[in-house]
Amino acid sequence: MSEIIESVKNLSIGFNSQKGKQISILRNVSTNIKKGETVGIVGESGSGKSTLALAMMGYIKQGLFPLKGECLFKSEDLLKMSSRQLEKIRGRKIAMIPQNAGQALTPNLKIGYQIDEALRLHTDLNKTERDKKISELLNKVRLPSPETMAFRYPHELSGGQQQRVAVAMALAGKPDLLLLDEPTTGLDVTTQAHVLELLRFIAKDTGTSMIYVSHDLGAIAQVSDRIVVMYAGEIVLEGPARKILKEPIHPYTYGLLKSIPKLSLAGLPASMPGSQPQPGSINEGCSFYDRCNLATDNCKKNSPDLEHIKELDTNVRCFNYKELINQNNNLQTSITKKSNNSEANEVLKLKDVSISYAKQKFFDQLLNKISDQNPTVKDINLSLIHI
């Protein structure tokens, strides 16, 4: 059995309203992070995913406080530690890769100096060893010319390069657990893919456990071994990534997957009606009741517990999950259809299109000679249909 790095037990976090009422934004959350495991925490804004992840570093946002429960890192409760005790853990044992690396990096300090600062804080290396380690870290995150890169300022790097530097700084202390809070926000699709591939490599190469927080289920699916789906401050589904993506047996997760656009299918992706309930507004019943097509009177009156489904190795918070098990062969069937008649709806068609430009020199131009052709586009076929 794999070693558990961190365990969250019955954690509730809340705040006091202006009327003095205690309101929960995390409710009875329990989960484990195993050694070498990457866990994706996904949910809409306000679902509590970032609050949970930060609590797993021993950090509670200003104005919030733990109502009950524990965050045990190697059997020690982070929520009961002093600031001095947490300083010895953060960076050295638990590190965080921020959402916006451009804002997290100090603009007037060179990259190498900032990584060196992390090494000075979290390791016992001397100056010569640190200089060597800086090059090793920059090389590990696949930045070109590490020796040159170390002398650049953050503004001289692209967004993807800045994110790689943030990863290098987080790895400086050789942490057991990495927290990634929306690390690809603001990056273009290609750069995002490169960063996600890098994270997969680092997880495999170093054996570091990771918590990946995002609202993007597609990104979560690419890096996670296990997925935790949160809604209105509760875990509604938890299990192996492949199982959840193939058989999303909670209606909220089912809706999230239906909302992902697919190039292979025509039509618009589905959207879920309504929005999450506000903190403190749920008095009884299932928190997803108002948005659920499977809801019954039982769902309105009673709140489901997180039930373990042994055959799927999955935990689900739903009375009617069995109704979803037989609906998972093709998530898009009910909302879209494949286009079988593209000719009838075709508005634009390119067939075997090639475009070249001439590498024409000055004297060739005077003599009206035909120069060598340099192809830029070759044999393109494209069909645009009206939906």
List the model feature ranges, each with a label.
Residues I4, E147, P240-E346:
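Short catalytic/signature loops enriched in Gly
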Residues R152-L157, Q161:
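Conserved ABC ATPase signature
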Residues L187-L268:
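P-loop NTP-binding/switch modules centered on Walker-like glycine-rich loops
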Residues A172-D176:
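A short, proline-enriched helix->beta-strand linker immediately N-terminal to the Walker B motif
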Residues F65-D77:
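Conserved ABC transporter NBD signature motif
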Residues I385-I387:
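Conserved small/polar residues in nucleotide/adenosyl-binding loops
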